[in-house]
Design a protein with these regions (language model features):
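Catalytic core of non-heme Fe(II) oxygenases with the double-stranded beta-helix
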Residues: 16-94, 104, 111, 121-132
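Non-heme Fe(II)/2-oxoglutarate
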Residues: 1-10, 30
Length: 133
């Protein structure tokens, strides 16, 4: 596949859409668990993450769930714990649109400002003009 993609006769035509929105959140704001299907990639840019979470607090942290829920009878927390991230000003996170995530309730006194976005592939066309078979 890699060699074929270097062939100038092989091309991919994509039709995409990009959407974004701003989130301005105050104390108590949160985001319940969700994903961004059918987006190929999603992300968030933190303009102002508000007050950082206190030690041992999850205030305003974004949490990504392990997608391997069908891994069998292994203790989930022991082998693949969720990923918790403390937002910082200027931080951008990009992740697969299917990845489940949520934001813990924000307990700071200031406002949080973030910009979320989705990149969706609406259609694609593979053209392999060099194909002989």
């Amino acid at each position: 596949m890699i060699e074929q993609s270097r062939n100038p006769a092989f091309s991919i035509s994509l039709k995409t859409s990009f959407s974004c929105w701003a989130n301005v959140s105050g104390k108590g704001a949160y985001s319940s668990m969700h994903n961004h299907n059918p987006a190929l990639f999603s992300g968030v840019y933190y303009v102002d993450p508000g007050e950082p979470a206190a030690p041992q607090s999850k205030s305003g942290l974004i949490e990504f769930m392990d997608p391997r829920v069908l891994a069998g009878p292994v203790p989930s927390q022991a082998f693949h714990p969720p990923v918790l991230l403390q937002p910082k000003a200027g931080m951008m996170l990009i992740f697969p649109g299917w990845l489940m995530h949520f934001v813990h309730p924000y307990q700071g006194s200031g406002q949080r400002i973030s910009i979320a976005f989705n990149l969706r592939v609406k259609s694609y066309d593979l053209n392999d003009l060099g194909s002989t078979g």
